[in-house]
Structures are given as structure tokens and as C-alpha cells.
Design a protein with these regions (language model features):
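ATPase catalytic-site recognition across NTP-hydrolyzing enzymes
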Residues: 215-276
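Conserved small/polar residues in nucleotide/adenosyl-binding loops
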Residues: 278-285
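Inter-Walker segment of RecA-like/P-loop motor cores
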Residues: 81-138
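Pre-P-loop entry segment of helicase/translocase ATPase cores
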Residues: 1-33
């Protein structure tokens, strides 16, 4: 008699560990409308937001919700899958990918939602026209990854689309950008200041993370990753330290680091000899230098 294989039972937990700093951020998000996780790469920011979003999704009365990234594909990979820790894995056995009124969606219904249908619409947000894909819908909660890569019009439209939500909650994550970026001046830093002045209603939750805050990565691997960077480079400051840097595209890094070393006071210049120090290459000079 052929032996039948029993279906694999759903495991109760997903094997992921959260450090104290991450736990504090997730815990605080329960009481805050806007939640922002910023910092270095591989710091665990996205997993925090996905977990918090899914936890709230179980009890929200709103049916339709939004998940966005720079492109639709990125939204499905980063938020839907998230290396095995995404929304589809949180609701494993209780969800399916499909379409909802023409939109890419994860349709959830099971024990975790009280057998009520909850729909997460996935959308790209990078283009100037991306906002059109979410017009006409009303959303409850919104989770956006790499929010600094979203177009401004999409961000504003997403806010407008959630005004009538029963549980209006938003989660963003991002790697550091130029300090003058609109996402800081118009939203993140503005909210931070308003919260400090007790002017922000609904609760604001901000946390900064680095790879050292991710306890799922071994110390040896962290050391290996750091060793691949020049500690003086903007990439180290941005990717490892999680700092906002405006120097991207800088050609003369040595000059920027120590300009005084290369500056000659005007009082020491012999202006009659300045022109002798300047050589302007002609196209012929450039061509001959290549021969």
C-alpha cells in the first residue's frame, strides 16, 4: 500500500531575531501613525516594518492597504518576499497572489485576520505618473520601502488616499540620502521637529540603525563587510555608518577632506606668474597624450 505524505504543518514562528533597539522601534510603532526606519544597509529596517505592518493587519477594520517601492517588482520582492520574512511569509498558508480590480495584490484571509479578507495592493512609485495607479482607492495602512526613491507626487497621493482610514498607520524605510532631499525637508525632519515641539498629532516614531544593530549577522561577517570599504569614503559613511551624505559625485575627495592643504593665501601669490602655472590643453594635446 502506498504511503501518503502528510502536509507540512505551518511553523509557529519565523526564525528571525530582533535586537533591543529593533524591538523598541516595533513596540513604539503600535502607538504611532508615522514610523520611519533609516540607516545603513543590512540593518534590518525592512523586516521591522513588515512585522509591524502585518501585526496591525490582523486586527485592522480596513480592507485595502498599500505596499510600495520604486518599482512594482521591487515592492513584491522587498516587501512581499523580503528574503523569507515578507508579508506573504507572515501570512503563509492564508494568502495568495492575484489581482484586485486590475491591481497586483496579495489577498489574505485566514485565522490571523479572523477569516476576514484583507488586501494589500502592491505598486511602483518612482515615476512622475506612478501616483495614477493608486488614485480612486481608499487605503487603510501604507508600507513604503526606500521611500526616498518614491516620486513626490506618489507620496502625497498615498497620504491623501488614507485620510478616511479607520486605522491610519504608515511605515517607511530608507538608506541615507542627501541631507537636502525633499523627503527630509518636507517630511522626515519636519515631522521630527513637529514631534519635538508637541505639534505632531498621531504619534511619530523614528529610529536610526546600522549593521551593528542587526544581531542576525555574525560579528565576523560584519567585519568582512566593513573591510571591503575605504573608511574615508562616502560609501562607508552611508552604507556602514548610515549617515546622510551630500558628497556623492565628488571628484577631488582629498581636497574636500582637507582644503586648507591646497589653498595658497592671496598674499603669497605673485600675480605676474599665475598665468605660467595654468595650462589649457587643446584637443591636439589630448590626442597626442594618448599616442
Amino acid at each position: 500500500m502506498a504511503r501518503t505524505t502528510k502536509p507540512e504543518k505551518r511553523k509557529k514562528t519565523i526564525p528571525y531575531n530582533f535586537g533591543d533597539k529593533h524591538k523598541a522601534y516595533i513596540r513604539k510603532s503600535q502607538d504611532c501613525m508615522i514610523n520611519v526606519a533609516e540607516g545603513a544597509v543590512r540593518a534590518g529596517k525592512t523586516v521591522d516594518n513588515v512585522l509591524a505592518f502585518c501585526h496591525e493587519l490582523k486586527t485592522t477594520k480596513d480592507k485595502i492597504h498599500l505596499a510600495s517601492a520604486s518599482t512594482l517588482g521591487n515592492a513584491k520582492i522587498i516587501l512581499g518576499n523580503c528574503n523569507g520574512f515578507g508579508i506573504e511569509h507572515f501570512f503563509r498558508g492564508q494568502c495568495r497572489w492575484g489581482k484586485y480590480k486590475g491591481n497586483e495584490a496579495l489577498i489574505i484571509k485566514g485565522k490571523d485576520t479572523g477569516f476576514k479578507t484583507r488586501i494589500v495592493i502592491f505598486s511602483g512609485a518612482m515615476l512622475a505618473s506612478s501616483y495614477k495607479s493608486i488614485r480612486g482607492n481608499s487605503y487603510g495602512m501604507w508600507i513604503g520601502t526606500e521611500i526616498n526613491l518614491h516620486h513626490k507626487s506618489f507620496v502625497q497621493e498615498a497620504f491623501n488616499r488614507s485620510i478616511a482610514a479607520d486605522k491610519r498607520k504608515i511605515w517607511w524605510d530608507l538608506n541615507p540620502d542627501n541631507p537636502k532631499s525633499w523627503i527630509y525637508t518636507e517630511y522626515i525632519d519636519k515631522y521630527q521637529q513637529d514631534a519635538a515641539d508637541c505639534k505632531f498629532l498621531g504619534g511619530y516614531n523614528y529610529a536610526h540603525f546600522t549593521i551593528d544593530d542587526n544581531i542576525n549577522i555574525s560579528d565576523q561577517r560584519k567585519a568582512e563587510v566593513k573591510s571591503q570599504y575605504d573608511p574615508t569614503s562616502i560609501w562607508y559613511k552611508r552604507d556602514i555608518l548610515g549617515l546622510r551624505i551630500a558628497a556623492e559625485g565628488l571628484i577631488f575627495q582629498s581636497f574636500a577632506n582637507d582644503p586648507e592643504k591646497y589653498i595658497i593665501p592671496e598674499s603669497q601669490l605673485d600675480k605676474s606668474k599665475i598665468l605660467s602655472l595654468i595650462h589649457i590643453s587643446s584637443p591636439r594635446d589630448v590626442e597626442e597624450s594618448r599616442m
